């Protein structure tokens, strides 16, 4: 029986893409993930995540990372909520893996609702398989199911790679990209002042952080 885990990295940042990772592995060898020391990606150092990502890809029966750019997120937010965006993105990963059982980290306050919505979305493109697949969604699934931890790790490593690429491309260290990061906020304030409140396409324009900074700049 094939099981899969799906998780995201970068849902909350104001800068950079979001990555949704999926890992598929035969249930009979899923214990390998525990042996590797797979754990919640947030609790691992970047170096350890990179090492594990390489091992995960080697042992997995399939994996896929779906990348969503800041501008794509902004466009989607015009017609749907962030929770709905997560459902669509998770379904994209599911389409690539087609396991017998999928464990998904719930991107909704109601985990069961997220599972139902994910299955409904998946059925739009894979109606036959949607009748057979079992969808399990839980909060903090990455801390419960090693296969979800594995998905979280490959997603986080890929997002970190993309963030470093952006820093090199723009020759700017904007920090982690999270609104709570002083370096990120400092970059946004400085850029906003220098460019009349306009921001580059690496920034999620629909984020409240950006709106707040624009309001601050108007007052000053």
UniProtKB/Swiss-Prot annotation:
Superkingdom in the source lineage: Archaea
GO molecular function: manganese ion binding; RNA binding; RNA-DNA hybrid ribonuclease activity
PROSITE patterns: RNASE_H_2
Keyword terms: Cytoplasm, Endonuclease, Hydrolase, Manganese, Metal-binding, Nuclease
CC terms in the record's Gene Ontology section: cytoplasm; ribonuclease H2 complex
Example GO biological process: DNA replication, removal of RNA primer
Cofactor requirements of the protein: Mn(2+); Mg(2+)
Residue positions binding a divalent metal cation: 7-8, 105
NCBIfam families xrefs: ribonuclease HII
Its biological purpose: Endonuclease that specifically degrades the RNA of RNA-DNA hybrids.
PANTHER family: RIBONUCLEASE (PTHR10954:SF23), RIBONUCLEASE H2 SUBUNIT A (PTHR10954)
Name of the protein described by the UniProt record: Ribonuclease HII
Organism: Methanosarcina mazei (strain ATCC BAA-159 / DSM 3647 / Goe1 / Go1 / JCM 11833 / OCM 88)
């Amino acid at each position: 029986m094939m099981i899969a885990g799906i998780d995201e990295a970068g849902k909350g940042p104001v800068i950079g893409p979001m990555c949704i990772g999926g890992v598929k592995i035969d249930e009979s060898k899923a214990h390998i993930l525990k042996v590797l020391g797979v754990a919640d990606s947030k609790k691992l150092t970047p170096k350890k995540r990179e090492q594990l990502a390489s091992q995960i890809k080697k042992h997995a029966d399939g994996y896929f990372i779906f990348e969503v750019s800041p501008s794509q997120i902004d466009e989607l937010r015009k017609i749907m909520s962030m929770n709905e965006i997560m459902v669509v993105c998770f379904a994209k990963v599911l389409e690539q893996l087609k396991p017998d059982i999928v464990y998904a980290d719930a991107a909704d306050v109601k985990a069961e609702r997220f599972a139902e919505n994910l299955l409904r979305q998946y059925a739009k493109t894979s109606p036959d398989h949607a009748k057979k697949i079992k969808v399990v969604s839980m909060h903090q699934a990455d801390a419960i199911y090693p296969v979800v931890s594995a998905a979280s790790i490959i997603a986080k490593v890929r997002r970190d790679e993309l963030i470093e690429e952006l820093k090199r491309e723009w020759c700017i260290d904007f920090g982690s990209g999270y609104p709570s990061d002083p370096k990120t906020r400092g970059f946004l304030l400085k850029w906003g002042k220098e460019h009349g409140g306009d921001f580059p396409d690496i920034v999620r324009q629909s984020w409240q952080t950006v709106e707040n900074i624009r309001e601050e700049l108007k007052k000053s």
